[in-house]
């Protein structure tokens, strides 16, 4: 495949496999000319779907494999028996430089384990992080980590801040994102030692984003900052809580607006406004969670995503592949190292001054 940008796709991942993946590709192509696809999985099933979407068929190469990773498969099992599966082959295509990014709607734990095994961690980075794109009052906030690491020390939280800011810049277009550390209060003395230490490091270092300081849980929905950084345990609990609340309110609104003739009339009158609200809160608009920190781009689509949602994940992967976000991460890691060296040596120069000099 000779085109410059190729996306490798696990066509068997998710709850619906090719029946969602292929229509998702067809939708994504409307806004992504010049992108081609490697589709890994059951060749017959993929070809049957491609026959319904000639545009997607014209830019896709099918690579048949007999195995697929189950949605309930444990990461250890996936690594033992995963070689030759659609997920494994999709990630491996990135390592072999056949594709610039991989998208899968498969098992999150298995995808993380296989991706780490095949691609390895990027230089100078300790841990990967999973990103969530969070609809807010002001647009979209990037939240990480939302499940890759149960615990994170100060240096890892700082790395998440650097990776999250680079991602937000690449995908959401903010030239200089604002970053906050999730905490139980905004005062310097609040929170765990790891969070306070990360706060001190970020405050003292000049990076390609603006560090806001501590933020609280309600600041996520307010959109107080562009990027919210936390450990994977806290981030995952926050994400699942928000998803549950969204379903609750959606069901309550639907139940209330169909509770009687007057309520139904009110719903009809407000249908335009309700449609706008539904669009704003539609999770498919913000689907696509990259596994940051790897030597390659891997984007996780929600397993239950529809074609719109899968198209969104493809757009995230494409935006990352076309950006210089990895160079931005490397640049900020060098500034961080320079700041630490300046503080340790006590040479009397400001940390921001030294760090800035490294990047010039």
Swiss-Prot record:
Keywords: Cytoplasm, Lipid biosynthesis, Lipid metabolism, Phospholipid biosynthesis, Phospholipid metabolism, Transferase
Family designation: Belongs to the PlsX family.
Listed GO biological process terms: fatty acid biosynthetic process; phospholipid biosynthetic process
Quaternary structure annotation from Swiss-Prot or TrEMBL: Homodimer. Probably interacts with PlsY.
NCBIfam families referenced in this protein's UniProt entry, alphabetically: plsX (TIGR00182)
Segments crossing the lipid bilayer: none
Gene Ontology molecular function: phosphate:acyl-[acyl carrier protein] acyltransferase activity
Function summary: Catalyzes the reversible formation of acyl-phosphate (acyl-PO(4)) from acyl-[acyl-carrier-protein] (acyl-ACP). This enzyme utilizes acyl-ACP as fatty acyl donor, but not acyl-CoA.
Record protein name field: Phosphate acyltransferase
Organism annotation: Caulobacter vibrioides (strain ATCC 19089 / CIP 103742 / CB 15)
A Pfam family matched in the record: FA_synthesis
EC number(s) reported in the record: 2.3.1.274
Pathway terms, separated by semicolons: Lipid metabolism; phospholipid metabolism
Domain of life of the organism encoding this protein: Bacteria
């Amino acid at each position: 495949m000779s085109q410059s940008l190729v996306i490798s796709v696990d066509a068997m991942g998710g709850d619906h496999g090719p029946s969602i993946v292929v229509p998702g590709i067809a939708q994504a192509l409307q806004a992504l000319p010049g992108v081609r696809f490697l589709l890994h999985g059951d060749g017959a099933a993929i070809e049957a779907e491609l026959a319904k979407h000639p545009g997607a068929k014209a830019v896709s190469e099918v690579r048949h494999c007999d195995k697929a990773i189950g949605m309930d498969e444990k990461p250890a099992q996936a690594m033992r028996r995963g070689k030759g599966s659609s997920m494994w082959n999709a990630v491996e295509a990135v390592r072999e430089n056949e594709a610039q990014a991989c998208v899968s709607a498969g098992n999150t734990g298995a995808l993380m384990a296989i991706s780490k095994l095949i691609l390895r961690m990027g230089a100078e980075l300790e841990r990967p992080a999973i990103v969530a794109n969070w609809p807010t009052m002001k647009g979209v906030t990037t939240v990480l980590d939302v499940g890759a690491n149960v615990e994170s020390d100060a240096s890892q939280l700082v790395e998440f801040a650097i990776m999250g800011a680079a991602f937000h810049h690449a995908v959401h277009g903010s030239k200089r994102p604002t970053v906050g550390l999730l905490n139980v209060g905004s005062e310097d003395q609040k929170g765990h030692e790891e969070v306070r230490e990360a706060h001190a490091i970020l405050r003292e270092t000049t990076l390609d984003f603006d560090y806001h300081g501590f933020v609280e849980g309600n600041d996520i929905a307010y959109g107080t900052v562009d990027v919210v950084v936390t450990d994977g345990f806290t981030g995952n609990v926050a994400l699942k809580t928000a998803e549950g609340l969204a379903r609750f309110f959606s069901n309550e609104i639907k139940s209330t607006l169909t509770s009687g003739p007057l309520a139904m009339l009110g719903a009809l009158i407000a249908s335009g406004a309700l449609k706008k609200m539904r669009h704003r809160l539609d999770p498919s608009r913000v689907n696509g969670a990259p596994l940051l920190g790897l030597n390659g781009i891997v984007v996780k689509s929600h397993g239950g995503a529809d074609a719109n949602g899968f198209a969104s994940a493809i757009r995230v992967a494409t935006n990352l592949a076309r950006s210089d976000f990895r160079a931005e991460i490397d640049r900020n890691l060098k500034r961080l190292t320079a700041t630490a060296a300046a503080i340790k040596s006590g040479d009397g120069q400001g940390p921001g001054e030294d760090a800035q000099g490294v990047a010039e």
